[in-house]
Amino acid sequence: MKIVADENIPLVNEFFGHLGEITRLPGRSMTAEDVRAADVLIVRSVTPVNAALLEGSRVRFVGTCTIGVDHLDQAWLEQQGIAWSSAPGCNANSVVEYVYAALCHLDIHWLHGRFGIIGCGNVGGLLYRRLKAQGVDVRCYDPNLTLAQNPDLTSLEDVLACDFISMHTPLVTTGSYPSFHLVGERELAQLRPGAILINAGRGAVVDNQALLDCLRVRHDVRVVLDVWEPEPDISLELLNEVAIGSPHIAGYSYDGKLNGTAMIYQACCKHIGVAPQADLSELVPPLDDNLLDTAGLTQPWPLAKHLIKQVYDIAADDARLREQAQLACAGNSEFGAGFDHLRKHYPRRREFHNYQVRLSAQAEAARHWLTVLGFRCV
């Protein structure tokens, strides 16, 4: 069996090696010729999987190591009898930790205001549960849910009136609830003074031109963008206006990536009728030094902020993206290639649950907060 896989998917050989011959290729430039002789195709969100890529190929199974599936032409795949699978929830924890890291970098105490979430699926739902467990006043907009599923559901207008807004919707262009440009000029005008807007879902859910126009006059609004419209050739003007910008890496924790690979491996084995041999728990490398320094802090908010910054310095992601923009503006590089380079060579970021915190007796009040965030308190 021949397997073609995106070169940026970790542990592909370790998981899929016993199933067949593996060819690893750049996902964004994958062509029909590249996959013509493949039986299995393993991709990420940068590879559009449709008739143009697969018509005339031998591919019978497509796996995407991502939560989102807007890059798959699902109707065409099903029409052709090509099985496909995604990895829902694989990097939800990673994205939620990105949101917390962004708030810490902006020095935003999330208890001091109302928090709005747009899209309460795997990612938004996890963020919702963590915030509620910390005592945050949360409002959610998701037309696909009922009040029985989430008692804090409300209108989009009510969510847009919150102090902090985090967006986690898939990109949907058809059906009853399309999300393309869900937040545009009219919605941005509803943001309250001093609002924080985070988009770590899909770039085109926010009208990026309307957002740029808004930020040019609304200097009180601070925006965090991990996803852009379009990618990889994002608006450098918009990058200059946002408080934090990153190259679509919110879900790029090493743990999240490995979860995605493992989920697609399991689905592939099931599809071809082979018993799985690889086990994620045996492949994940342990951290050598996972005890964090509390710096003598004892109160929940200052201690949480200090620990999060130790584990994940989101400012470094922002700085690397802006450095690529400066190189492009100086004519020393092509920005789109630089954007992809940052994603391909992203540092190994481990999630909070890999780290231990030794609490003093004076810091016991912070135990619940830190446990909700995922840290292991000892």
UniProtKB/Swiss-Prot annotation:
Keywords: Cytoplasm, NAD, Oxidoreductase, Pyridoxine biosynthesis. It catalyses: 4-phospho-D-erythronate + NAD(+) = (R)-3-hydroxy-2-oxo-4-phosphooxybutanoate + NADH + H(+). Belongs to the D-isomer specific 2-hydroxyacid dehydrogenase family. PdxB subfamily. NAD(+) binds at D142, T169, D226, G251. SUPFAM superfamilies: Formate/glycerate dehydrogenase catalytic domain-like, NAD(P)-binding Rossmann-fold domains. It comes from the Bacteria. This is Erythronate-4-phosphate dehydrogenase. The keyword Oxidoreductase applies. One of its GO terms (cellular component) is cytosol. GO terms for biological process: 'de novo' pyridoxal 5'-phosphate biosynthetic process; pyridoxine biosynthetic process. It comes from Cellvibrio japonicus (strain Ueda107).
